[in-house]
Regions:
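Short, Asp-centered acidic motifs that coordinate Mg2+ and/or phosphate
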Residues: 71-75, 154-155
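A conserved helix-loop-strand patch within extracytoplasmic ligand-binding domains
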Residues: 78-79, 85-135
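Short, structured active-site "lid" loops
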Residues: 47-73
Length: 280
């Protein structure tokens, strides 16, 4: 196959991620085109994700297009993937990861009101800033920063990966990069995942050629841990891995509990099970 149709969300960040995948495939002689799909999460941009609830808010409609063979691959922010992909679909590749950290972007030195629409971020912010008021915040990166600039919030929490990929200038603000100890990232944060049909042999071979093995070494443990936690957007859950050579450190957040564990990469499944037992 020398041409692929990509199913994707239509945000500026999503389209930039499509470009990254397309550029990688092009080096292997594959051309692409994008079909934009509006997901349930896109259609409701008012309510907090934790209030909409459910699993795969930004994924399921795209997976349907893939399953119906109207597209060859789907490009996602891996943090949006539910722990259970649709039957018959697999993650065929991941692209080189961007930074996985969350950023606290600050307008006012005296932080009284912090904006986020994520249950995970809200839970962690309440630990870090117990006196602050947490207010809901939705929208794309530009919308969220505009609301911050307009004075609706003193600070907001945003993923560094999106800022980096879009080249957004944060110089008007003070920026605090949060460590995994301060805020456990979402599973797959900073990773672009490419989904395809399990029976699409040729597509899977072409994706294997562009897969980033180093990122996959982080992606697989995070996905395994996330699957053990079995959570959705309505729950404060984080699953993060830091790989250093043959060593791995795993971080987990589940509701009001968090913990970490380190060991050999080859033992990541056992480490994940131990960590999940600690926090659940």
């Amino acid at each position: 196959m020398n041409h692929m149709v990509i199913a994707s969300r239509g945000s500026r960040l999503s389209l930039r991620q499509d470009e990254i995948v397309s550029e990688s495939l092009k080096k292997n002689g594959v051309t692409t085109e994008v079909t934009v799909i509006r997901t349930r999460g896109d259609l409701d941009s008012t309510h907090a994700l934790k209030d909409i609830g459910g699993s795969g808010l930004f994924i399921r409609e795209i997976e349907q297009v893939l399953a119906d063979r109207e597209a060859d691959i789907a490009v996602h922010s891996a943090k949006d993937l539910p722990y259970d992909l649709r039957e018959g679909l697999v993650t065929g590749a991941v692209m080189p990861a961007a930074d996985s950290a969350d950023l606290l972007v600050i307008r006012n030195r005296e932080i009284r009101v912090i904006g986020t629409g994520s249950a995970r971020r809200e839970a962690e912010i309440r630990r870090l800033y117990p006196e602050a008021e947490i207010r809901g915040l939705r929208g794309n990166i530009e919308t969220r920063l505009r609301k911050l600039e307009d004075g609706a919030y003193d600070a907001i929490v945003i993923a560094e990966a999106g800022i980096d990929r879009l080249g957004v200038d944060l110089s008007p603000f003070q920026v605090k990069k949060l460590t995994p100890e301060e805020m456990v990232p979402a599973c797959g944060q900073g990773i672009i995942a490419v989904e395809c049909r399990a029976d699409a042999t040729e597509v899977r071979e072409q994706l294997k050629a562009v897969n980033d093995e180093e990122t996959m070494r982080r992606f697989l443990p995070e996905r395994y841990l996330f699957g053990l936690l079995r959570a959705d957007c309505s729950m404060p859950v984080g699953a993060h891995a830091v790989v250093d050579g043959d060593r791995i450190t795993l971080y987990a957040l589940y509701m009001d509990k968090k913990s970490r564990i380190s060991g050999s990469c080859s033992d990541y499944r056992e480490l994940c099970r131990t960590l999940a037992d600690r926090v659940m």
